[in-house]
Regions:
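Rossmann-fold dehydrogenase core element
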Residues: 9-19
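An anion/phosphate-binding loop that grips the pyrophosphate of nucleotide cofactors and donors
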Residues: 151
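Phosphate-binding beta-alpha-beta segment of Rossmann-like dinucleotide-binding domains, i.e.
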Residues: 17-68
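Single conserved hydrophobic/aromatic residue that forms the stacking wall/gate
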Residues: 1-7, 11
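Glycine/threonine-rich flexible loop motifs
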Residues: 1, 159-168
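Short, ordered loop/turn segments at secondary-structure junctions
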Residues: 17-23, 97-99, 117-118, 159-160
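Glycine-rich phosphate/diphosphate-binding loop of Rossmann-like nucleotide-binding domains
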Residues: 56-147
């Protein structure tokens, strides 16, 4: 078969985010493994570009305060970013619309950013955050402004299943 005949075939595409996030499908879950690497690499790249050190350092010349890192999104990439930043000695804050993420974030030693109370209860679908209303997004941005203005590094990992990632900054 020639290359031109192969190119004319109709190719089938499947969105990898539609694979179920269950243990039986774990061997096919390439998104989680790639997200894990992305979260790790994001912190390493940020640390190499930052004009200061991540951990607190006490020297004869004085004390260098630890870097402050804000991670937006507490999924696979976000949790890996938290773990990596904490291992490097940073103070880490995390924002996610899913209340269940708070426990995971705190178990890694990060501080969870409490979002404003609204009538809408954001949730998740298949392990991903659901889309929220523009009103909620506006209130979320207002809450994050304080944390982001004090941060040395911001890592954005927030995703919505089947949609464009939310613009939080």
């Amino acid at each position: 078969r020639t290359v031109s005949s192969a190119a004319s075939d109709v190719y089938k595409r499947q969105s990898l985010e539609l694979l179920p996030r269950i243990s039986r499908a774990q061997s096919s879950d390439v998104l989680s493994s790639q997200a894990n690497i992305a979260g790790y690499k994001a912190v390493l790249l940020a640390a190499s570009e930052l004009d200061r050190y991540f951990p607190m350092l006490m020297t004869a010349a004085g004390t260098v305060q630890p870097a402050k890192v804000v991670v937006l999104g507490g999924g696979v990439a976000g949790l890996q970013a938290v773990a990596t930043a904490k291992r490097l000695g940073a103070i880490v804050f995390v924002s996610d619309i899913r209340p269940a993420v708070k426990e995971q974030v705190e178990s890694l030693g990060a501080r969870f950013i409490e979002l404003p109370e609204v009538d809408e209860k954001p949730g998740e679908a298949g392990g991903y955050a659901k889309a929220v209303t523009p009103e909620f997004l506006s209130k979320q941005k207002a809450t994050l402004t304080k944390y982001l203005s004090e941060a040395d590094v911001a890592i954005c990992t927030a995703q919505v299943l089947g949609k464009k990632a939310p613009v939080l900054i």
